[in-house]
């Protein structure tokens, strides 16, 4: 079996985040492996499968173990195009980025609408999102404080960069519209700034809160520009959407 090391795993291991809901749990919020036994007709011994979220390392033991037992509605068949290793190389970060892409597509985000800015660009979700967006023909702007990582981000597909420290975020209900859309891993003031600077009918996929969970904005971007704020939750997700995202990770969204 394989399992990744994710941001939430680090928070759980260091005790810096309220991740573990029980005092003794195996870590690992995702894993891939081979079915050793099943009470469900959906899976048989020997099937290759994967699991992301579903309370792993929060309310039940996670993937840092030789064996794991999980509800059948959390399990996704390994898609064609991915090995067990590939699946966890992408892991929760890839799954989350794929969900963000699907949400943007469903709300009619398209390359002609303008550049898409990705915050937290050098992180797992940000890096994979840049690759996916560029692969679909979007102009991608990387928002980062790590100037020494520009070459890396350019290789992924970013065509321009925003230095986090140099941004004047302003305080008006609406600022100059610059972005066709956004994938935000940061939250806080950065997400509020994005709501004020995304173009009319643009979308923001909100994924993370590395800079804080409070969002201080107004209704103006939503009612005057038609901006849509799209939440992305990789933990609680219908099985159909889980399977759909992983199928695409093995096909057109594969890095």
Where are these regions (language model features)?
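Short amphipathic alpha-helix with an adjacent loop that forms part of the alpha/beta core around
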Residues: 167-178
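Glycine-rich phosphate-binding loop and adjacent beta-alpha segment
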Residues: 189-254
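Glycine-rich beta-strand-centered segment in the early N-terminal region that forms part
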Residues: 1-5, 14-56
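N-terminal Rossmann-like NAD(P) cofactor-binding module of classical short-chain dehydrogenase/reductase
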Residues: 50, 180-183, 205
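NAD(P)H dinucleotide-binding glycine-rich loop of Rossmann-like/cofactor-binding domains
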Residues: 51-117, 255
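Mid-domain Rossmann-like dinucleotide-binding core that forms the NAD(H)/NADP(H) cofactor-binding site
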Residues: 88-164
